[in-house]
Amino acid sequence: MAMRRKRILKEKCCDFSIDIPVPIQNELIRKGGLKGLLSQIPDSAELLINSRLHQALADPIRLTVMNALLSQPLCVCVIKEVVKIADSKLSYHLNILKEQELISGEQQGNWIIYSITDRGRQVLKSTERSEKEMRGRVAS
């Protein structure tokens, strides 16, 4: 069974000549060409900030810490028991979460008590919603 090929236009699109499918070309033209498309993409500084946030979330240990802190503020000794890693590794992970303002630590006597920030709570809720939507689409 032969596959039908999509009709491709060989016309000037944007500021250069490339072969692209007609629907893609039409949508690109509607957006103002390549310049219009590029105007919708965040600048490199914003993309760098977003990538660092996603890197912070891309580790199961850090997600475990954040989810534990959703329940209540915790001291390092309890967090260490939850994630079962060495002090140096835990410190590394906590610092990444603090740098992204996902958690905060407050000195209380001899302890540092960690809490999830509003930003951290919002990010977790957002990823949870996204995850539920993905599971719903896969189940359909």
Task: List where the protein language model places each region.
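N-terminal helix-turn-helix DNA-binding core of bacterial DNA-binding proteins
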Residues: 42-89, 112-119
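Short alpha-helical linear motifs
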Residues: 89-93, 131
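Functionally engaged cysteine thiol sites
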Residues: 75-77, 100, 134-135
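Amphipathic alpha-helical dimerization/coiled-coil segments
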Residues: 2-49, 118-140
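Short, hydrophobic-biased segments on the C-terminal half of alpha helices
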Residues: 66, 94-95
